[in-house]
């Protein structure tokens, strides 16, 4: 027989499982509704521009570009997200139409696109579940990087091969794209030296903040992704060495 503690744990697990099942059912119905809306007859002749986002946290990489489109044009943005709780659904902007699509429907949605342009921060187009459209072959696929590092050092081989246009965060990255094309023998892409909107936003927000001076200096530890980075190799010693020195 279960003792009281075990019984409570079991009840909590069963409750969590039931909640997860209910949420999954709700999200499945939501995805079905948005998928149907996306391919509605109303959209068929009017859909020009599609953004794809992996989740709510990715909007910040699109933000500056989207705001420029809203300010300078009347183009409707069809914003597809894999996150049912994406903050995009709370935006009251008539030029943005958001859709939640689950992973299974995302595969067919991408293959059936008939828009003119797709913008995404997700690399590896055509290599995994996200494919170019099989219905309209001349869609322009734009890759907008969500980092500001080396494409060659951080992505898989061929991660950008199937994009038509790269929004480069720097001139160095633009040069790197050309060198990758030469090395792999792939077709030349359009390159737009776009910069990195997230940093632009951070600078703007800082300038508007009045530049407050913190009483304590804050140390930001930012490990890289490679093997034996700070987190794996020396984090404990590093943090211990900073104790009691007046830092936050």
PLM feature segments, named:
Residues 58-74, 197-248:
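Conserved catalytic-core segment of nucleotide-activated headgroup transferases in glycan assembly
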Residues 32-34, 141-147, 209:
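Short, functional N-terminal and low-complexity linear motifs
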Residues 43, 135, 160, 212-213:
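Short, flexible hinge/linker loops that cap or flank conserved catalytic cores
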Residues 10-14, 28, 32-36, 87-90, ...:
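Generic detector of well-ordered alpha-helical segments enriched in charged/polar residues
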Residues 1-50, 71:
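Non-catalytic N-terminal targeting/anchoring module and adjacent flexible stem/linker
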Residues 50-203:
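Active-site and donor-binding regions of nucleotide-sugar-utilizing enzymes
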Residues 38-44, 150-155, 214-216:
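Short amphipathic alpha-helical segments, especially helix-boundary/capping motifs
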Residues 45-49, 139, 216-219:
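Nucleotide donor/acceptor-binding cores
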């Amino acid at each position: 027989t279960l003792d009281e503690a075990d019984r409570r744990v079991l009840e909590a697990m069963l409750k969590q499982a039931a909640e997860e099942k209910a949420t999954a059912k709700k999200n499945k119905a939501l995805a079905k509704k948005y998928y149907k809306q996306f391919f509605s007859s109303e959209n068929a002749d009017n859909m020009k521009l599609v953004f794809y986002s992996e989740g709510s946290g990715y909007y910040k990489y699109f933000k500056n570009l989207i705001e420029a489109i809203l300010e300078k044009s009347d183009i409707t943005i069809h914003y597809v997200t894999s996150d049912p709780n994406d903050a995009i659904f709370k935006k009251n902007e008539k030029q943005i139409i958001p859709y939640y699509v689950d992973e299974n429907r995302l595969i067919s949605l991408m293959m059936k696109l008939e828009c003119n342009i797709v913008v995404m921060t997700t690399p590896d187009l055509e290599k995994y579940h996200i494919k170019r459209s099989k219905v309209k072959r001349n869609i322009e696929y734009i890759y907008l990087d969500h980092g500001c590092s080396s494409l060659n050092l951080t992505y898989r081989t061929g991660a950008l091969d199937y994009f038509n246009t790269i929004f480069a965060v720097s001139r160095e990255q633009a040069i790197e794209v050309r060198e990758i094309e030469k090395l792999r023998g792939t077709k030349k892409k359009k390159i737009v030296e776009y910069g990195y909107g997230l940093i632009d936003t951070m600078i703007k927000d800082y300038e508007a903040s009045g530049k407050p001076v913190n009483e304590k200096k804050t140390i930001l530890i930012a490990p890289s992704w490679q093997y034996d980075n700070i987190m794996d190799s020396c984090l404990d010693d590093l943090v211990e060495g900073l104790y009691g020195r007046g830092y936050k």
